[in-house]
């Protein structure tokens, strides 16, 4: 943590005005010398603790996203170097970098009668363009973002604080579909994560493209999507129901024969109901550091 200090111009003006004092030259000169030395030392320590280039963490994230996704598009995965570049930025992100604390109203659990229902999840929109989007999901305890997909996207997720369970799947590409809305998927992640932890990455066809978030404690997740959802371009957010392999399988199905093979697989069925019927996400104004000019 750095020391609070006035802007450099004010500090230098203050030093200059003090040096112009002429009364009691010996004592005043010594006193001013000590004060000036202390102020300049404080200023130097403040500069050391600040970003070397004077750019905030969220601005650095924005600039990096512009570079990483500059030639992106549906199904286009950034190069490994660019993925690592963005991952390193996200790994260092902290709640205070985006103006969040766990005591904010977004993270309060339901109480009374409301405690029986899933608490609302707040989405803070930071930026969106054709190439990428940046946003934050704020989840109270027991908050759930249902199982959903990310068509043609590369997605970076950074848990800023709290504890969250993540379950994710990828499609089994060569397996026949159960019906027009039901496909076989293989489990990718089924684990609980606690901040601080590194960012996770999913890809168009790998890394757990369909995932569900469940808040164990109050938590916040910073999401970067490249490219973002876009209904006119066919990148819809689709929600799924999850069924054990035996639940929808028949005797004629020979997708997976042995019990060992069946472990870690499930049927994912596209939901027909309105997403608003099973999601409780509300938008709120982002009040953290500026993302762009």
From Swiss-Prot:
A GO CC term assigned to this protein in UniProt: nucleus
GO terms of biological process kind: anaerobic respiration; cellular response to hypoxia; detection of hypoxia; peptidyl-cysteine oxidation; response to hypoxia
Any one GO MF annotation of this record: cysteine dioxygenase activity
Protein name according to UniProt: Plant cysteine oxidase 1
Induction: Up-regulated by hypoxia. Up-regulated by the ERF-VII transcription factor RAP2-12 during hypoxia.
Summary of pH dependence: Optimum pH is 8.5 with CGGAIISDFIPPPR peptide as substrate.
Chain spans, region Disordered: 250-293
Residues making up the signal peptide according to the UniProt record: none
Species of provenance: Arabidopsis thaliana
Major subcellular location class: nucleus
EC category: oxidoreductase
Protein family: Belongs to the cysteine dioxygenase family.
Cofactor(s) required for function per UniProt: Fe(2+)
Record's compositionally biased regions (Acidic residues): 251-262
Cofactor annotation remark: Binds 1 Fe(2+) cation per subunit.
Catalysed reactions, as listed in the record: L-cysteine + O2 = 3-sulfino-L-alanine + H(+)
Keyword Cytoplasm applies: yes
Function: Catalyzes the oxidation of N-terminal cysteine residues (N-Cys), thus preparing the protein for N-end rule pathway-mediated proteasomal degradation, upstream of the N-end rule enzymes ATE1, ATE2 and PRT6. Controls the preparation of the group VII ethylene response factor (ERF-VII) proteins for degradation via the 26S proteasome N-end rule pathway. Acts as an oxygen sensor that controls the stability of ERF-VII proteins, which are stabilized in flooding-induced hypoxia, and regulate transcriptional adaptation to these adverse conditions.
EC number: 1.13.11.20
Domain of life: Eukaryota
Bias (Basic and acidic residues) ranges: 269-279
Pfam families linked to this entry: PCO_ADO (PF07847)
């Amino acid at each position: 943590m750095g020391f609070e200090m006035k802007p450099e111009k004010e500090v230098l003006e203050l030093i200059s005005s003090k040096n112009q004092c002429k009364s009691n030259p010996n004592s005043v000169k010594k006193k001013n010398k000590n004060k000036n030395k202390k102020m300049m030392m404080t200023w130097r320590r403040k500069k050391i603790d600040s970003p070397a280039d004077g750019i905030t963490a969220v601005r650095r994230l924005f600039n990096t996203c512009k570079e990483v996704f500059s030639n992106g598009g549906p199904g286009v995965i950034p190069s490994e170097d660019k993925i690592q570049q963005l991952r390193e930025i996200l790994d260092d992100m902290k709640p205070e970098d985006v103006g969040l604390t766990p005591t904010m109203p977004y993270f309060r659990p339901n109480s009374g009668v409301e405690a029986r229902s899933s608490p609302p999840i707040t989405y803070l929109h930071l930026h969106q363009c054709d190439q990428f989007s940046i946003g934050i999901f704020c989840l109270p305890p027991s908050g759930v973002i249902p199982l959903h997909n990310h068509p043609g996207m590369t997605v970076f997720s950074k848990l800023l604080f709290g504890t969250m369970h993540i379950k994710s799947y990828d499609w089994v590409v060569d397996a026949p579909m159960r019906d027009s809305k039901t496909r076989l998927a293989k489990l990718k992640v089924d684990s609980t994560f606690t901040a601080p932890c590194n960012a996770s990455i999913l890809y168009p066809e790998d890394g757990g493209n369909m995932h569900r978030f469940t808040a164990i404690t109050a938590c916040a997740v910073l999401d970067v999507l490249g490219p973002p959802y876009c209904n006119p371009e066919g990148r819809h957010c689709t929600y799924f129901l999850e069924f054990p392999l035996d639940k929808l399988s028949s005797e004629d199905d020979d997708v997976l024969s042995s019990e060992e093979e069946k472990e870690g697989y499930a049927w994912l069925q596209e939901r027909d109901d309105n997403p608003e019927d099973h999601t409780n996400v509300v938008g709120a104004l982002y009040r953290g550091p500026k993302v762009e000019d």
